[in-house]
């Protein structure tokens, strides 16, 4: 007999009035007695709080608040506590004699909401000697103690050996421990379970009939038929899973590429990146090596460029220095040429001016003669005009006088006067005072003779004058010529100087004639000298370029040597070209072959992958195509054998399934028709009656009843006789046994038990011998055992069938794979490895590249040598023709000598050019210099005197002529004579006047004309003199300028200066061109050096970066490789055919796969997050993690009972193999799993019958319970009418509603709900789904209606309601119902908990004074009979005779409240005994904490 667990004590720490109080609880009834406010309700509240520490439920209201849904804000708990740490602990001893202390730590939370903080805990393994108050308090002195905090309590308990302390964060865990240890009767899994438990405690505490409990008695009293419900749920779950699997298979069949897509895209995504990183790593290594090679090459190039830069800079410096000298020389040559040209122009001007001066001098001399002649003529014309004028005047005067005399009779007197005047003038002119008119004629002849003499003398002097003047002009001309040539000199030195000048002129003219030959000779020599200098320069440059000094004699030999070297290098270059062509051709052939192999490699690799897969799948090694075809024939034979074995295993599995189905019939009937027949005849199957027989007794009873073990037990056989008529739907043998199904026994037979057999005497003359069956199936235990063994066999058969089916499918797919391989890859699979040949060819290609590089280097060096040799030969070709010049050492001296001679000749030429004309003029007149014509001036004076004398004589003769002509006038004596004589004279005078006037007019015109001509001649002469003087002055200036220029100007000097300037210009241009070339080359070299420096820095940076990248990538790659190898995915990721794709192609492939994967994993949060993380290009290992996550995800989705592999790829392949087989198998399984509606109705009916029987048993326990007028209490259980109709339809008329139960779209629960709605259309189902309604209809509790009835006085059985009962009757009735609930919970919990634990039973009752003594005695009797503990609270007038009573008195001591407690155990027949732990708490008011 298992002892029931008991609550030993209740401990309150720091509650209002209780500092540290422990209440020992009685095994039956503990009574708390005391007045109002003594602390009874506080004590019970502490107990309830320790049992249910749920603040959402706890509500300690006063009795006056009964029925209220909301009381004070703190719900009564805050005010029952003191400040600080508080405890409520229960000390329990369970059925296993384990001491457990459970409780809660409470603490008020500051604030207006008056909240309380609760922490549940449990203590196990506590020694019996340790009191609860000792655990949570610490004694400070004799009158003071302190409450420990929960942490201090834990530390204290941890120090105690064997004591376990547990603190709970959830109430569920707390109640789970209490249920497992037998402290509470029911497992409180949820808040609703805790609510039910609290409502039970609350109903017990406050007494009466709780409407909350009576309205839901089914939930409290009727246990959940978890087995049946679980069976239905498992069946539906299996069906649902089956249908979901079928749907998944259909989805998989319709979207067969789902997994393939995910794994293929994941493989493409990761493998492409994996291979790209592998390729990049190889490329980076190659780049690093290439960078290093380029770095070394660039360093060499930079050093070579630096050497080249130094040479060119040195050469440029030389050219810059030479350019300055050449520029100076060129500028000097240009200036010299300009000076020569200027001198030539000056010389031309001088010559032109000299010619002009000579011409002007001639013209001047001629003009002087013309002017002199014109002057003489002018003088004559003037004298003639003057004479004519005088004659005209005289004639006019005479004529006037004659006219006047004629006019006034005085003409004779006038003429006489005029004659006298003429005589007087003649006397004056002739100095003849004695002159008379008569002697005038004589004197006229004298004076005419004198005039003739003067004229002749004048002519003689004029001739002499002309001769003297000519001699004087020649002397002056010669003297001026000598002075112009020699400079100022004395006149007496002119003759000797002129002779010297003429001799020197002859010499100078001889020298001047040699200028042109000397100039030509000098030009030739200078050209040779320049060629010699050019040759020396070329030789110096040649030696400089050759880096060695060569003598002139060595140049011809060197030329031959260089010619031979050029020929050899030319042959070498041509041979090198052919060799290079051969190497390049071989390289191109290798490259073409490598390209071809690289194109063929992916095909070969695909064939190898397919071949490797075939080898892995078949476990064979194939070395030729013949092996493949032979193995394909073996596969066909193996497939036929596997199909035969699979069909045999399938037949046996079907037989086992049929047997399992037969044994799984409700009630143990092997024929489903027996259940319907049993219901029809109102009986019970014998197998159902013996359903509880043990497995050990099953063989006996199976043998006992033999064939009748499937009989139907009916109360009366006579009642079924009529029903047997026309019975066709039944087994061949149908047995009936008469008996009471409730009290059936096996006494209907006479039986003798033998060893493993029985002899049944069915009649006096009929015995039956039955051996115990080897595999009994009579009774639920035997059937379950047999079903279990059949299930085990079925599992084996199913596994074998699945294995064989998988093998068949695998063989078929392997056959298909071989067929595909033969069709696609057989032609190339067994060819040589192209990658090995590629590696070999790459090695050869590297050798060729190295040979080409070496060859190019050698060829470059040969080309340089060839170019150097060509340059040397070219320089020698220019040098060799000038070897004689190089050997001529006297050339410069000869040039100097000729230059001196040329200078002398040019000086002479300049002298002749300057004075040649003067010497030529001087030579014919040089003799006039012997005598100096000094008398020329005296002659000029004589000539002037003679001229004046001749003029005076002419005037005197003219005056005498006039006197002679007027001699007649002296004889006028009278006027007649005068008139007659004057008339002729007048006529003559008039005639002479006309003649004289005509002569005067001619003389005047001649004079004017001659005067104008003389003026013109004088103007011409003045102009000629002015021009002569100007040109002479300009000539002097030009000669001075020519002397100032200091350049000898001749016909060849300009050409030589120009040639020299052009040569220097050519040299300067060549120098500048070379300098520009050098500058450009230097700039290019510097740029190349800068480029090389930058490139070198870039290469160094790139090399270091690439090296760091390689090192970093190596670490990352090692991590990736480690992860790949650890997860075994290298075979999937290292796809060698991807190595032949470019990085862009691989990146594109990865990006495309990434886009597809984003869509594929959009609904999977984990894979989506991992995929998002894997997109980081700097973390390639995350892509491996994603691939592993995909594999893991697919592995988790692989059903190991279907597909036996961890590899998702193989799983996908196996999945395709299993799809068709699973579809067929699951379809048949669904048909087997589907339970019939009749079976459901039978199960629900049997469950209802069983629970009705159990309620009847509970009612028997309450028959003797009475409270006041209530004599008995019972529970009435009835089936609802609507649900009874549903059961009838399910049993009898289910064929009419097969459209619901045969629908694949509806679960059984939904079909059941649809049927219920179809049968009861008037019922409103609300918002509930058919699935929810169907699940409720599968719960038998929803078919029942329960109500509490009491047998009260004369009213008989009435429905128990608070309004119809008194307070005491209601309390007693309610307590009875609660006892039934607790007992029902224990029965339910017994199936969930160990059977060796009997839980504690405890109820409360507050304000028990409302019960009378008989009712209280009934409670005590009920507690004793049911082994239940009861805590009641009553005023002091309640004094029960049994149990333990605590009297509580609240006192005030020093302004502090405390409760004085005295405990008594019994008191009527026994002596009073003070319980331990009671007495006044003297120190409670002074306690700290």
From Swiss-Prot:
Entry's Gene Ontology molecular function annotations: ATP binding; DNA binding
- Which intervals of the chain are annotated as region Flexible hinge? 666-783
Q: Which UniProt keywords apply?
A: ATP-binding, Cell cycle, Cell division, Chromosome partition, Coiled coil, Cytoplasm, DNA condensation, DNA-binding, Nucleotide-binding
Q: Tell me where it mainly resides.
A: cytoplasm
Q: Is RNA-binding included in the keywords of this UniProt record?
A: no
Kindly give the Pfam families that the UniProt entry links to this protein: MukB, MukB_hinge, SbcC_Walker_B
For the ligand (ATP), the binding residues are: 34-41
Q: Which family does it belong to?
A: Belongs to the SMC family. MukB subfamily.
> What is the annotated quaternary arrangement, including any partners?
Homodimerization via its hinge domain. Binds to DNA via its C-terminal region. Interacts, and probably forms a ternary complex, with MukE and MukF via its C-terminal region. The complex formation is stimulated by calcium or magnesium. Interacts with tubulin-related protein FtsZ.
What is the name listed in the Swiss-Prot or TrEMBL entry for this protein? Chromosome partition protein MukB
Provenance organism? Citrobacter koseri (strain ATCC BAA-895 / CDC 4225-83 / SGSC4696)
């Amino acid at each position: 007999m298992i002892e029931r667990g008991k609550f030993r004590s209740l401990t309150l720490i720091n509650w209002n009035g209780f500092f540290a109080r422990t209440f020992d609880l009685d095994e039956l009834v503990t009574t708390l007695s005391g007045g109002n406010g003594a602390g009874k309700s506080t004590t019970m509240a502490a107990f309830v709080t320790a049992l249910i520490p749920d603040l959402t439920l706890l509500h300690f209201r006063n009795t006056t608040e009964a029925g209220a849904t909301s009381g004070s804000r703190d719900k009564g708990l805050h005010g029952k506590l003191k400040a600080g740490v508080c405890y409520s602990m229960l000390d329990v001893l369970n059925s296993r004699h384990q001491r457990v202390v459970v409780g809660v730590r409470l603490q008020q939370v500051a604030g207006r909401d008056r909240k309380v903080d609760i922490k549940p805990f449990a203590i196990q393994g506590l020694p019996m000697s340790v009191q609860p108050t000792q655990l949570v308090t610490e004694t400070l002195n004799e009158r003071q103690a302190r409450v420990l905090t929960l942490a201090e309590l834990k530390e204290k308990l941890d120090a105690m050996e064997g004591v376990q302390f547990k603190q709970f964060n959830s109430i569920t865990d707390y109640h789970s421990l209490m249920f497992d240890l037998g402290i509470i009767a029911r497992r409180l899994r949820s808040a609703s379970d805790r609510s039910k438990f609290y409502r039970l405690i609350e109903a017990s505490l406050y007494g009466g009939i709780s409407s909350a409990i009576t309205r839901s008695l089914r939930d409290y009293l009727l246990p959940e038929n978890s087995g049946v419900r679980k069976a239905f749920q498992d069946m539906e779950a299996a069906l649902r899973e089956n249908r979901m699997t079928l749907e998944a298979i259909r989805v998989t069949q319709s979207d067969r590429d789902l997994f393939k897509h995910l794994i293929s895209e994941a493989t493409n995504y990761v493998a492409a990146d994996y291979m790209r990183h592998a390729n990049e790593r190889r490329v980076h290594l190659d780049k690093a090596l290439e960078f290093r090679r380029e770095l070394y090459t660039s360093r060499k190039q930079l050093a070579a460029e630096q050497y080249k830069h130094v040479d060119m800079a040195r050469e440029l410096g030389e050219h810059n220095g030479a350019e300055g000298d050449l520029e100076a020389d060129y500028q000097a040559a240009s200036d010299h040429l300009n000076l020569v040209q200027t001198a030539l122009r000056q010389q031309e001007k001088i010559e032109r001016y000299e010619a002009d001066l000579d011409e002007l001098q001639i013209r001047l001399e001629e003009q002087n003669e013309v002017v002199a002649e014109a002057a003489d003529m002018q003088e004559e014309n003037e004298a003639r005009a003057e004479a004519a004028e005088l004659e005209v005047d005289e004639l006019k005067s005479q004529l006037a006088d004659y006219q006047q005399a004629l006019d006034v009779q005085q003409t004779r007197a006038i003429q006489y006067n005029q004659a006298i005047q003429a005589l007087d003038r003649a006397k004056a002119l002739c100095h003849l005072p004695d002159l008379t008119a008569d002697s005038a004629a004589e004197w006229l002849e004298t004076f005419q003779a004198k005039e003739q003499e003067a004229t002749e003398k004048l002519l003689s002097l004029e001739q002499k004058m002309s001769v003297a003047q000519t001699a004087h002009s020649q002397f002056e001309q010669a003297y001026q010529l000598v002075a112009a040539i020699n400079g100022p000199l004395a006149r007496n030195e002119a003759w000797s100087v002129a002779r010297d000048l003429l001799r020197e002129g002859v010499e100078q003219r001889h020298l001047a004639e040699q200028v042109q030959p000397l100039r030509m000779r000098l030009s030739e020599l200078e050209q040779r000298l320049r060629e010699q200098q050019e040759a020396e320069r070329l030789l110096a440059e040649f030696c400089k370029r050759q880096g060695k000094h060569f003598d002139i004699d060595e140049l011809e030999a060197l030329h031959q040597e260089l010619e031979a070297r050029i020929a050899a290098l030319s042959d070498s270059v041509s041979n090198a070209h052919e060799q290079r062509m051969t190497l390049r051709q071989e390289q191109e052939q290798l490259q073409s072959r490598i390209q071809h192999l690289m194109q063929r490699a992916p095909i070969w690799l695909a064939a190898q992958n397919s071949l490797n897969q075939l080898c892995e799948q078949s476990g064979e090694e194939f070395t030729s195509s013949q092996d493949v075809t032979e193995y394909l024939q073996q596969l066909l034979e193996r497939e036929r054998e596997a199909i035969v074995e699979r069909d045999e295993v399938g037949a046996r599995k079907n037989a086992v399934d049929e047997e399992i189905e037969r044994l799984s019939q409700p009630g143990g009937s092997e024929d489903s028709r027996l259940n319907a027949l049993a219901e029809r005849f109102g009986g019970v199957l014998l197998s159902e009656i013996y359903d509880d027989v043990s497995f050990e007794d099953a063989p006996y009873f199976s043998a006992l009843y033999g064939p009748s073990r499937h009989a139907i037990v009916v109360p009366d056989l006579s009642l079924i006789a009529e029903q047997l008529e026309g019975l066709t739907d039944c087994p061949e043998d149908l047995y009936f046994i008469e008996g009471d199904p409730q009290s059936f026994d096996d006494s209907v037979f006479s039986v003798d038990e033998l060893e493993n057999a029985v002899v049944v005497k069915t009649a006096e003359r009929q015995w039956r011998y039955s051996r115990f069956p080897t595999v009994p199936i009579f009774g639920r235990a035997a059937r379950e055992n047999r079903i279990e063994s059949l299930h085990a066999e079925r599992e084996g058969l199913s596994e074998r069938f699945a294995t064989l089916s998988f093998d068949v499918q695998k063989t078929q797919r392997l056959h298909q794979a071989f067929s595909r391989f033969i069709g696609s890859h057989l032609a190339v699979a067994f060819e040589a490895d192209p990658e090995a040949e590629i590696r070999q060819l790459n090695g050869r290609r590297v050798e060729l590249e190295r040979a080409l590089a070496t060859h190019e280097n050698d060829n470059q060096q040969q080309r340089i040598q060839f170019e150097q040799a060509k340059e040397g030969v070219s320089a020698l070709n220019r040098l060799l023709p000038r070897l004689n010049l190089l050997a001529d050492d006297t050339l410069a001296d000869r040039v100097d000598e000729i230059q001196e001679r040329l200078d002398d000749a040019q000086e002479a030429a300049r002298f002749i050019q300057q004075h040649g004309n003067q010497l030529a003029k001087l030579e014919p007149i040089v003799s006039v210099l012997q005598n100096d014509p000094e008398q020329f001036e005296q002659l000029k004076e004589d000539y002037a005197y003679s001229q004046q004398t001749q003029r005076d004589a002419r005037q005197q003769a003219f005056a005498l002529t006039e006197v002679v002509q007027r001699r007649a006038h002296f004889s006028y004596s009278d006027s007649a004579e005068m008139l007659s004589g004057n008339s002729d004279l007048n006529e003559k005078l008039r005639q002479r006047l006309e003649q004289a006037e005509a002569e005067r007019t001619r003389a005047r015109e001649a004079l004017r004309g001659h005067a104008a001509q003389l003026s013109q001649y004088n103007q011409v002469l003045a102009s000629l003199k002015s021009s002569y003087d100007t040109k002479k002055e300009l000539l002097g200036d030009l000669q001075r300028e020519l002397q100032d220029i200091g350049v000898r100007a001749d016909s060849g000097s300009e050409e030589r200066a120009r040639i020299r300037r052009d040569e220097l210009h050519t040299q300067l241009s060549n120098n500048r061109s070379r300098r520009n070339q050098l500058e450009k080359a230097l700039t290019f070299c510097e740029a190349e050096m800068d480029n090389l420096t930058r490139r070198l820095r870039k290469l160094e940076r790139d090399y270091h970066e690439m090296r760091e990248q390689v090192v970093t990538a190596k670490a990352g790659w090692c991590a990736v490789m480690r992860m790949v190898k650890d997860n075994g995915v290298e075979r999937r990721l290292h796809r060698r055919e991807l190595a032949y794709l470019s990085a862009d192609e691989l990146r594109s492939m990865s990006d495309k796969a990434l886009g597809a994967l984003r869509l594929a994993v959009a609904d999977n949060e984990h894979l989506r997050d991992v995929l998002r993380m894997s997109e980081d290009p700097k973390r390639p290992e995350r892509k491996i993690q994603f691939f592993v996550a995909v594999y893991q995800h697919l592995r988790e989705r692989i059903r190991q009972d279907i597909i036996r592999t961890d590899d998702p790829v193989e799983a996908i392949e196996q999945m395709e193999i299993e799809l068709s087989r699973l579809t067929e198998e699951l379809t048949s399984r669904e048909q087997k799993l589907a339970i019939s509606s009749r079976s459901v109705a039978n199960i629900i009916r049997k469950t209802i019958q069983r629970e009705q029987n159990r309620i009847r048993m509970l009612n028997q326990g309450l028959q003797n319970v009475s409270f006041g007028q209530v004599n008995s209490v019972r529970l009435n259980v009835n089936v609802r009418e609507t649900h009874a109709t549903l059961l009838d339809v399910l049993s009898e008329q289910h064929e009419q509603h097969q459209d619901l139960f045969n629908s694949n779209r509806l679960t059984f629960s939904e079909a059941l709900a649809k049927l219920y709605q179809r049968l009861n259309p008037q019922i409103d189902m609300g918002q509930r789904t058919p699935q929810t309604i169907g699940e409720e209809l599968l719960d038998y509790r929803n078919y029942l209606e329960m109500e509490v009835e009491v047998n009260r006085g004369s009213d008989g059985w009435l429905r128990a309601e608070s309004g119809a009962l008194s307070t005491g009757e209601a309390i007693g009735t309610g307590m009875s119902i609660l006892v039934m609930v607790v007992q029902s919970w224990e029965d339910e919990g017994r199936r969930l908990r160990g059977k060796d634990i009997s839980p504690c039973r405890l109820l409360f009752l507050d304000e028990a004074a409302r019960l009378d003594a008989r009712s209280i005695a009934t409670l005590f009797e009920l507690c004793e009979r049911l082994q239940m503990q009861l805590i009641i609270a009553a005023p002091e007038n309640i004094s029960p005779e049994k149990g333990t009573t605590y009297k509580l008195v609240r006192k005030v001591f020093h302004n502090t409240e405390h409760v004085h407690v005295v405990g008594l155990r019994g008191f009527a027949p026994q002596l009073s005994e003070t319980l331990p732990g009671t007495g006044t708490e003297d120190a409670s008011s002074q306690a700290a904490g």
